[in-house]
Design a protein with these regions (language model features):
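Short, well-formed alpha-helical segments that are part of the catalytic scaffolds
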Residues: 14-28
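Cell-envelope/extracellular polymer assembly enzymes that use nucleotide-activated donors
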Residues: 5-7, 34, 177
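A conserved acidic beta->alpha catalytic loop
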Residues: 39-47
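Acceptor/aglycone-binding surface of glycosyltransferases and processive sugar-polymer synthases
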Residues: 61-75, 80, 92-172, 176, ...
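Active-site acidic short loop of glycosyltransferases
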Residues: 3, 32, 76-79
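Hydrophobic helical membrane-anchoring modules
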Residues: 2, 169, 174-318
């Protein structure tokens, strides 16, 4: 198995104005790295200019950033991965520090943190600022963590993270999925504060504030259900139980006063709603036990991957 020491992964869609500079900057700060540009059906000269700058250019024909990342993670083997967008909004000067945290300090994911520096002043799209803050707050509360930038497109990964990450999303919600995967599996997450700069003039963002924002929030709910089923279904059970109690109180009150059940259909609906609440609660318990089993299997898989990586490194040295 051929394994790169450092692989720089650049997903691109119509980035002809910036991709050449991003590749050159990556080569300058990481001269020993192999730089891969994955072209996602660009209609401009992105692939041509990336190859001219010295990158290995490959194509992903299924549209969407999640699909590109799935292809990259499947095809590239490396001890350390740097993933950066091709829009020149992230400084490559931070890459060596991020690599060091993976290779020397055993980090599984290093987050290029924009939100602790210049993002809110440089970014000219106010709803993006609100969305980033909302997503960060939601995930940190739901998953009891303290990740400073959930949506950043600038990250470093270990081999173990890349080869265990199941890519389920197809679009920009992929960053949220990565963060939750690392948090839920107790992977080591480090942070590097970076200076964010807005896109250069003539370079348009591919992120749709509203539709992609809804997808991200939907992904958070889905992953909370999948990774924290006890919490999710307990909340659902509580809501159903409260609803049943609210509507059954007038029925019970009327029965005490008159000795008759005047709203029999309401009583039946409340009974079924309470049964649904109990089912939701016990479903959460069952799924929580299944999740625990999956965690045990994941740890075994992680150990096997670590041995596989060490064998690959030894082969490279020989």
């Amino acid at each position: 198995m051929k394994m790169d020491k450092i692989a720089v992964l650049i997903p691109c869609y119509n980035e002809e104005k910036t991709v050449e500079k991003v590749v050159r900057d990556a080569r300058k700060v990481l001269p020993d790295a192999v730089i891969y540009v994955y072209n996602n059906n660009s209609s401009d000269r992105t692939a041509e200019l990336a190859a001219k700058a010295g990158a290995v250019v490959r194509n992903e024909y299924m549209q969407g950033k999640g699909n590109v990342i799935r292809r990259m993670f499947r095809e590239v083997d490396a001890q350390c991965y740097i993933m950066v967008d091709g829009d020149d909004t992230y400084p490559m000067e931070a890459a060596p520090e991020m690599v060091e945290k993976v290779l020397q300090h055993n980090a599984d994911m290093v987050v290029g943190d924009r939100l602790s520096s210049t993002y809110f002043t440089e970014n000219k799209r106010p709803f993006h600022n609100f969305g980033n803050s909302l997503v960060r707050g939601s995930i940190n509360r739901l998953f009891h963590c303290n990740v400073r930038d959930i949506m950043t497109g600038y990250r470093a990964f270990s081999y173990e993270f890349v080869k265990t990450f199941p890519v389920l999303s197809t679009g920009f919600e992929i960053e949220t999925e990565m963060t939750i995967h690392a948090v839920n599996n107790n992977m080591q997450i480090d942070n590097v504060i970076i200076e964010y700069r807005d896109r250069p003039e003539g370079s348009a963002s591919k992120l749709n504030t509203y539709s992609d924002g809804v997808k991200v929030l939907r992904t958070i709910v889905r992953l909370y259900r999948d990774y924290k089923p006890m919490g999710f279904f307990t909340v659902l059970a509580a809501l159903l139980a409260i609803l049943a109690i609210i509507f059954i109180i007038p029925v019970i009150t009327a029965y005490w006063e008159t000795g008759q059940v005047r709203k029999f259909p309401t009583l039946i609906v409340c009974g079924f709603t309470m049964i649904a609440a109990l089912q939701a609660f016990f479903s959460g318990m069952i799924l929580s036990n299944m999740s625990l089993t999956n965690r045990r299997e994941f740890e075994i898989q992680l150990n096997q991957l670590h041995r596989h990586k060490l064998e690959g490194m030894m082969e490279e040295e020989q």
